[in-house]
């Protein structure tokens, strides 16, 4: 029996879209993450779509980002931005809230948040 992917465990495309949209809604509405919001364009439509496509594949679903843009090269794509531990923590604050609003299962929350943290931490490009 094949193990289900996180994408399948979450419920597929609709749930990944909700998670992405909620993440950005939190970023837009929480003044404590304004420096993170300021790293993004005024119109978040393209950012929302790219994160949705990335998360789809990253979670084990359709590789939408790769099909459209090629390999994600996350660190390279984030090099124009000063990503330090504060930016990582703001990103995680938004994602943590979105994941906690979405999921009831503690084991799945913990698994996802650990993976998100590891990825967000890898994005840091500023010496501290």
Give, region by region, the residue ranges found by the protein language model.
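Core of compact, soluble alpha-helical bundle domains
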Residues: 1-128
